[in-house]
Amino acid sequence: MIVRNVKDVIGTPDEVRTDTWVSRRVLLKKDKMGFSFHETTIFPGTRTHIHYKNHLEAVWCIEGDGSIETIADGKRYDLGPGVVYALNEHDEHWLCGGKEPLRVICVFNPPLTGQEVHDADGVYALPQAETA
């Protein structure tokens, strides 16, 4: 059994920060669960281009506000407590912070190793062993 407190991730390499978000990666590939589990906060007033070509992601919004806009069709969805969205088709999108920090719980398949950040195309690359 694995038991962790997200507070124990703060200040470790499993807490990854960019200009638009901070992600506390609680379960990772090394845990051998088949998915990774993260608590992420999207900063207010930010806009992040994301396109998970190599991963599927499900997101549960816990607190705060923001929006997500699909690039293919320009549809915009408001995000707030209780909203769940799933990027089941590797949907390219903009994730936008609102007036308050948006705290979300994310599940990724395949699992992240822990240090991933979006590249110039909004993608998390697969580890070298998985791309060979």
Curated annotation (Swiss-Prot):
Task: Alphabetically list the UniProt keywords.
Answer: Lyase
The answer, when asked if Lyase is one of the entry's keywords, is yes
Q: Which InterPro entries does the protein's record reference? A: Ectoine_synth, RmlC-like_jellyroll, RmlC_Cupin_sf
Q: What reaction(s) does this enzyme catalyze? A: (2S)-4-acetamido-2-aminobutanoate = L-ectoine + H2O
The annotated pathway is: Amine and polyamine biosynthesis; ectoine biosynthesis; L-ectoine from L-aspartate 4-semialdehyde: step 3/3
Q: Which SUPFAM superfamilies match?
A: RmlC-like cupins (SSF51182)
For the keyword rRNA-binding, the answer is: no
Q: What is its EC number?
A: 4.2.1.108
Q: Per the UniProt entry, what is one GO biological process?
A: ectoine biosynthetic process
Example GO molecular function = ectoine synthase activity
**Root EC class:** lyase
Q: Which NCBIfam families match?
A: PRK13290.1 (NF009806)
The task this protein performs is described as:
Catalyzes the circularization of gamma-N-acetyl-alpha,gamma-diaminobutyric acid (ADABA) to ectoine (1,4,5,6-tetrahydro-2-methyl-4-pyrimidine carboxylic acid), which is an excellent osmoprotectant.
The entry assigns this protein to a family as follows: Belongs to the ectoine synthase family.
Q: What is this protein called?
A: L-ectoine synthase
Species this chain originates from: Bordetella avium (strain 197N)
Upper taxonomic lineage: Bacteria, Pseudomonadati, Pseudomonadota, Betaproteobacteria, Burkholderiales
Gene this protein is translated from: ectC
